[in-house]
Amino acid sequence: MEWEPVIGLEVHVQLRTQSKIFSGAATAYGAEPNTQACAIDLGLPGVLPVLNKEAVKLAVCFGLSVNASIPPYSIFARKNYFYPDLPKGYQISQYNFPIVQNGHLDIENEDGTTKRIGITRAHLEEDAGKSFHEGMQGYSGIDFNRAGTPLLEIVSEPDIRSAQEAVAYLKALHSLVRYIGVSDANMQEGAFRCDVNISLRPKGEEKFGTRAEIKNVNSFRFVERAILFEINRQKEILENGGTIVQETRLYDAVQDETRSMRTKEEAHDYRYFPDPDLLPVEIGPEFIEAVKNQLPELPWEKRKRFAASYQLSNYDVKLLTTQIEIANYFETVLKIDKTIPPKLAANWINGDLAAALNKNNLSITQSPINAEQLAGLLHRIADNTLSGSMGKQVFETMWGGEGDADTIIERHGLKQITDTEALEKIIDEVIENNPTQVEQYRSGKDKLIAFFVGQVMKATKGKANPQQVNELFKKKL
């Protein structure tokens, strides 16, 4: 029997606010444990939560970017459960009346086709604290710094049918929330976490199978590996006549497997009820319009503009717009020097710069070569001061911190030889010293032109303009 995976994702996105969702405590990452938790975060008697307006604005911003509806009001509810890092004994979340409803996000599959993934809802909630078990003898520690940090939980429809589609959706969502400034979405810091709901059903059937939920997967690769393992696990059980247990599972990256944590809770297990300390949130059309007017250019809008304005290939556009920081870097280079061909800038950013960043595990915001320095280098390539190979040499020197392109060119004597008279003298010598190859070229072996150009490049220590040399040889031969 052929089985079809049915996958839905719940993504927890930490909102980019200076303070927490219901208190004035800071949300900065990396502070000493329990130094950013106030009485409200700890749920001490007599305190009352006050909603952070910026969190509401960011949630609405996300909703508009995925073509969702923003209801006129939403309600906060208490989600009741016990866990040591949940100080109040309940989490303030949203249940029946979320702030964002019925949106969608289009993804591009590996074969180039587009698929629309529905977004059921996105709701605001507070994060819990964090438990620590390692390095503690006989006890666990709790850091409440994260408690009360604003989260937007984004729940997809069960429209995903493979691990590849799940990763494509996550990457598109990750890119979007960074583009619109909703979140830094730093996965290493837990600002973008994913729960995977997965079930199998016979291909062609409409009825859903029993699902398992894999909690808190924090990398694209781990999501893919967890889904592939879970599909095989459930398939093996079903084909051997067993039944799938509805449960919560954990992905173990070391063993590359999912393990059972507990049976899966239903909504009634959490005893949701409206939080009496918080009024319903009214969201008027004026507020929505104000947020809409502040929406930045969305990723798919930027891709369309790049292709039209800069005449770039889909491949180049896709690489340049993967991250907003890369797109901004590219456009900054072109704004600094309008004589630089966009294709030249795209080639260097997607090629040499990307390779150097990956090799050193750096983001483009950490690049030792800023946009102004790269623009200086590309200007010298565009005006034929440097050949492509010489440009690479300058790039490597610049990466090492030796200054801008002009300084390096002057210091190392790297200026390209473009003087026609000087080049013709060298070309004449090459022709005189290689009569056999000249005869072969004239009898039809056109590929020998590369040999002649190579001889000139060798004689000039790579400083000749290879295109110019090529043209001069063809004239003389």
From Swiss-Prot:
<dbReference type="InterPro" id="IPR018027">
    <property type="entry name" value="Asn/Gln_amidotransferase"/>
</dbReference>
<dbReference type="InterPro" id="IPR023168">
    <property type="entry name" value="GatB_Yqey_C_2"/>
</dbReference>
<keyword id="KW-0436">Ligase</keyword>
<keyword id="KW-0547">Nucleotide-binding</keyword>
<dbReference type="InterPro" id="IPR006075">
    <property type="entry name" value="Asn/Gln-tRNA_Trfase_suB/E_cat"/>
</dbReference>
<dbReference type="GO" id="GO:0050567">
    <property type="term" value="F:glutaminyl-tRNA synthase (glutamine-hydrolyzing) activity"/>
</dbReference>
<dbReference type="InterPro" id="IPR017959">
    <property type="entry name" value="Asn/Gln-tRNA_amidoTrfase_suB/E"/>
</dbReference>
<dbReference type="GO" id="GO:0050566">
    <property type="term" value="F:asparaginyl-tRNA synthase (glutamine-hydrolyzing) activity"/>
</dbReference>
<keyword id="KW-0648">Protein biosynthesis</keyword>
<protein>
    <recommendedName>
        <fullName>Aspartyl/glutamyl-tRNA(Asn/Gln) amidotransferase subunit B</fullName>
        <ecNumber>6.3.5.-</ecNumber>
    </recommendedName>
</protein>
<dbReference type="InterPro" id="IPR004413">
    <property type="entry name" value="GatB"/>
</dbReference>
<dbReference type="Pfam" id="PF02934">
    <property type="entry name" value="GatB_N"/>
</dbReference>
<dbReference type="InterPro" id="IPR042114">
    <property type="entry name" value="GatB_C_1"/>
</dbReference>
<dbReference type="GO" id="GO:0070681">
    <property type="term" value="P:glutaminyl-tRNAGln biosynthesis via transamidation"/>
</dbReference>
<comment type="similarity">
    <text>Belongs to the GatB/GatE family. GatB subfamily.</text>
</comment>
<dbReference type="GO" id="GO:0005524">
    <property type="term" value="F:ATP binding"/>
</dbReference>
<comment type="function">
    <text>Allows the formation of correctly charged Asn-tRNA(Asn) or Gln-tRNA(Gln) through the transamidation of misacylated Asp-tRNA(Asn) or Glu-tRNA(Gln) in organisms which lack either or both of asparaginyl-tRNA or glutaminyl-tRNA synthetases. The reaction takes place in the presence of glutamine and ATP through an activated phospho-Asp-tRNA(Asn) or phospho-Glu-tRNA(Gln).</text>
</comment>
<keyword id="KW-0067">ATP-binding</keyword>
<dbReference type="Pfam" id="PF02637">
    <property type="entry name" value="GatB_Yqey"/>
</dbReference>
<comment type="subunit">
    <text>Heterotrimer of A, B and C subunits.</text>
</comment>
<dbReference type="GO" id="GO:0006412">
    <property type="term" value="P:translation"/>
</dbReference>
<dbReference type="InterPro" id="IPR003789">
    <property type="entry name" value="Asn/Gln_tRNA_amidoTrase-B-like"/>
</dbReference>
<dbReference type="InterPro" id="IPR014746">
    <property type="entry name" value="Gln_synth/guanido_kin_cat_dom"/>
</dbReference>
<dbReference type="InterPro" id="IPR017958">
    <property type="entry name" value="Gln-tRNA_amidoTrfase_suB_CS"/>
</dbReference>
